[in-house]
Amino acid sequence: MLLIQNGVILDPYTGTEQVSDILIGDDGIIAEVAAHIDAPQGAQVYDACGRTVTTGLVDVHVHFRDPGQTHKEDVFTGAAAAAAGGFTTVVCMANTIPTVDSVGTLRYVQERAAQVPVNVLQACAITCGLKGKELTDFEALHAAGAPGFTDDGVNLTDAKLCYEAMLRAKALEVPLSFHEEDPKFILSPGVNAGSMAAIQFGVPGAMPSSEECMIARDIALAQRTGARVAFQHISSALSVDLIRKGRELGADIHAEVTPHHLSLTELDVLEHGTNARMNPPLRTERDRMALIEGLKDGTIDMIATDHAPHATEEKDRPFAKAMSGITGLETAFSVCNTALVHAGHLSRMELMTAMSKNPADFYRLGDRAIAPGNRAELMIADWDEPIVYTEYKSKSTNTPFTGKPLFGRVYAVVVGETLVEN
């Protein structure tokens, strides 16, 4: 048994905050929540020391590079990074080598995921080989445990095929997640078109229209099909406006935003270079503030890291030749706490709703409230403790947040009966 004492429970499922102890049975199920619980004989006792005990973070968008590129990350190091960052559940993208578009490859990831303490779910590809030509076998993959489908990393440009995918997903009541970047508007990826960084690095960049056009199209398709759809890592003010209008029209649409798009702008690319190169790129301060407003009014309902590890030599190149993407699992809580809570934009409860409850609800992971009878998925953290990241559990260190003063330290996560301390 595990007894967590002297914690301040912050529960986004009930909207309550209270000082309580939590007793977790050997089966990983919460047995009791009370103001004071005496330790049963033989129980492991963890003193939270007045820190927050909240529901574990859920990241619906990570890349563990497993199979195929395990020099960057694998299920084991990715899970360690997730736990260090406060995440108890993550959803891996399908753009591995080979693509997760078959039951066999899905089983490979599931077998490795069964060996780590956090919940690692594996989404499957919408199209075979991410080629945008033929739909995968949704039915067989869903039956084998795929929680949803995505061609993340590439845009599904064929509108008719996208429509058919939504119909199939709706019939199975599983979600789809879309990487919305029309390549016709991307002359060079990873930097905002027309920005000072694009000029400095001598590249034309990626236009916001690449994202906005695809979102507009897929809102219409989602409205017609009734499919549950998420727009991944949105980056522009107009995208927020389009999604807001789509929600008003009744479409079952959802939106992710990354910690880096909430805290950085195109100007930061000048300082951090390739460690601030990602798809979609960082945009203007106006876009950043629109993303925050979208979070505040619920238009954007999920914060997701798009954790994208790359080897040092893949980033240590001229900007135009470097890989896009940054790591995010270990820094996400601190970055969001600093940029959103400490900056006065969101409450702690609102941040936990966006980083824990809403992502879990999108994948229908069930009731994760901190209450007797529910499986324990917890994060223990100090919101106000300063922290500077210099070392990582991830195999990769491609992040602009190294050495940056932040607030918010994760001390431990609990997944079922397992306590993982930092």
Regions found by a protein language model. Name each.
Residues V109-Q115, F138-A143:
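Acidic (Asp/Glu)-rich catalytic clusters
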Residues G7, P318-K321, R375-N422:
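C-terminal cap of metal-dependent C-N hydrolases
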Residues M1-G56:
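Histidine-rich, glycine-flanked metal-binding segment
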Residues C49-A113:
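Metal-associated gating/positioning segment near the N- to mid-region
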Residues E111-I126:
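A glycine-rich helix N-cap at a beta->alpha junction
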Residues Q200-R228, N275, K296-I303, A308-W383:
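His/Asp/Glu-enriched, well-ordered alpha-helical/loop segment
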Residues K133-I303:
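Histidine/acidic residue-rich metal-binding segments in metalloenzymes
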Residues G7, I22, D27-G28, G50, ...:
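Divalent metal-coordination and catalytic microenvironments
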